[in-house]
């Protein structure tokens, strides 16, 4: 059985006339140096001008300074501090510990001039910390994650870094509209958007019409987007729906639209490749992105 081709829709946004700026591309460094300045140079050698934050503790002031200065010296922006834990863990002690971990993560992001600290909003699943649960789409979930976002931001009071919740296919925010509603409910300038369109593709309609999905995200969330993920999605045909992540260019995501819209955002928003298995897959994915970028008149340099 063959999967029909993806529909590429026209955007209502004036993409052709909008000014475009170079996109900062980033990804992980395999076997990277522990020295921040050397690690930043390794990023540049790979063609990257954005990076994931190196490991660092909040109380290690010297390393925080070295990361901030070493990456800035080499014009490499730290896109995100990822703190991956369940802010809605059923165990009160673990939930409190996880909340503090994200507070520390946002404080680290502020110290190293990262664009954001990112985590999923959480899950009520008792067995898998990021897993599906019926209540992950409920008002109870929405209210709890809004309260957590306020607590985290109010504890740090960042002036530059944003707190973001990663989009998910089975937990809020699971759409542009639910993210926009969350932004309004949190009501803090330091709450931003981390765009991961592949995570939103959870049904055939979104898979086939991912161009429209991308345009909706940029149209509705553009002013708040501070960092983005790059991966691709393929439909493996089975007796039920099964989408799998694949290297860029091997799936269905409309990167012509993604790159065009990203290059016209008002901010300098990094695009971070993720979830690939080897340095070779990242290099091939970067090659694909640069080819598409050239076709649509977008630069990474």
Task: Label each region the model flagged.
Residues 81, 147-247, 252, 261, ...:
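Acidic/histidine-rich catalytic cores of soluble enzymes
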């Amino acid at each position: 059985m063959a999967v029909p081709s993806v529909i590429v829709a026209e955007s209502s946004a004036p993409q052709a006339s909008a000014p475009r700026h170079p996109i900062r591309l980033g990804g992980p460094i395999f076997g990277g140096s522990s020295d921040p300045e050397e690690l930043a140079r390794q990023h540049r050698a790979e063609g990257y001008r954005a990076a994931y934050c190196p490991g660092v503790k909040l109380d290690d002031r010297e390393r925080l300074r070295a990361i901030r200065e070493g990456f800035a010296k080499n014009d490499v922006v730290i896109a995100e501090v990822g703190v991956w834990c369940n802010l809605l863990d059923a165990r009160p002690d673990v939930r409190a510990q996880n909340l503090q971990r994200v507070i520390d993560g946002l404080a680290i992001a502020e110290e190293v001039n990262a664009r954001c600290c990112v985590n999923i909003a959480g899950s009520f699943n008792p067995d898998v910390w990021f897993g599906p649960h019926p209540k992950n789409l409920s008002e109870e979930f929405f209210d709890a994650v809004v309260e957590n976002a306020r607590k985290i931001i109010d504890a740090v009071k960042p002036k530059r870094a944003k707190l973001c919740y990663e989009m998910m296919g089975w937990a809020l925010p699971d759409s542009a509209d639910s993210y926009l509603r969350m932004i309004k409910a949190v009501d803090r300038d330091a709450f931003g958007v981390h765009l991961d369109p592949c995570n939103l593709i959870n049904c055939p309609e979104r898979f086939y019409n991912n161009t429209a999905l991308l345009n909706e995200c940029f149209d509705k969330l553009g002013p708040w987007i501070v960092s983005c993920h790059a991966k691709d999605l393929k439909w493996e045909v089975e007796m039920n729906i099964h989408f799998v992540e694949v290297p860029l260019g091997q799936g269905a995501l409309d990167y012509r639209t993604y790159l065009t819209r990203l290059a016209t955002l008002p901010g300098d928003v990094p695009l971070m490749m993720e979830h690939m298995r080897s340095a070779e897959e990242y290099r091939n994915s970067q090659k694909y992105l640069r080819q598409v970028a050239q076709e649509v008149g977008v630069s990474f340099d």
